[in-house]
Amino acid sequence: MTGVQTCALPIFIRDNPDAFDTALKRRGLPAQAKNLLAIDERRRAAIAKSEQAQARRNAASKEIGQAKAKKDEAAAQALMAEVNELKATLPQLEAEAKAAEDELNTVLATIPNAPLAEVPEGADEHGNVEHHRHGAKRDYAFTLKQHFELGEALGMMDFETAAKISGARFVVLKGPLARLERALGQFFLDVHTGEHGYTEVNPPLLVSDDTMFGTAQLPKFAEDQFSALSGREPREVAIDALNVAIQEARKTDVDPIDDEARFRSFYDSAWNSVPKQVRRWLIPTAEVSLTNLVREQIVEEGALPMRLTAYTPCYRSEAGAAGKDTTGMIRQHQFTKVELVSITRPEDSDAEHERMTQCAEEVLKRLDLPYRTMLLCTGDMGFSSRKTYDIEVWLPGQGRYREISSCS
């Protein structure tokens, strides 16, 4: 069949509609199985009709030759009429199949991952459960300052200059503090690659729509991302190209503007010469690039687990951060982060998740930072997650634990 790419409804949903709806309910979402099954049935029916019409057209085309060989002109003419009718019908059938396909994909793209049974139910962060903690909070005999107060007082953290350069929620780190950030990143990488079995990767920071979709950043979280378009607006480039072409033509020929057909030809040529603008997304986390290293690939079982790490800048617009704490270096638009990604067999996923969390905790233990590990509830964990641990470090200046790592 031509013109229709199929995307079947996940087998789990078709075979377990009640369990699927129960998982959505735990996420605080309405049932979707009945709607998805109905859309998929329309899609499959439309594809079947299109395939049947295509098969009949192919068969009739062969029969035309057979009829002509028998000198049965009437039969040949009738078959040719049938082929033409089928040829005219096929685009509509393919369009119906694609419409159902697009509808199915649109709905599926809005559905989060199903939480594991041990994930607690809850509406927001208040439903999270402390899993364990490590290290004792220290007492100090003096008034504590917050990180940004210390950084600014020492001349190593400059929010004002960063705001002039880029706007709010950026920072310039200077001197020993800039070196400390770099050293911490290198320390994390050395531990994870040298002791935990991860392979360091230096991935692209600008990625495509498909790459963002593959890690569930799109379409749901588009407003939380930064994107960049290459080149100028196509219309501006086309106008410039058209003006150049007209000026060149005027040197040797009549003015093409006086001839509507020639002007249209010049315009079409100018427009077709314009390079198309390409959108790329700045990664919100290196997880996006690392996970997509194996997208649409078949990985040999013997190569698993595949453990990857990267130290990269990350970019987030955090459009939904209104009303949340953005003090100092909290919820910056740009920050650096060491990412861990493991590609495993499905049956090894839970154990690998626990191991990854322990790897993240290990660097905090070596830095002697008190922390606690929280098991997120269904209403607070990420869209693509089945189970998430947040590791929260104790910040003495704020007198509270703050998230420093999220392991899903």
List each language-model region with its residue ranges.
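Short, flexible helix-adjacent loops and helix caps
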Residues: 25-29, 65-72
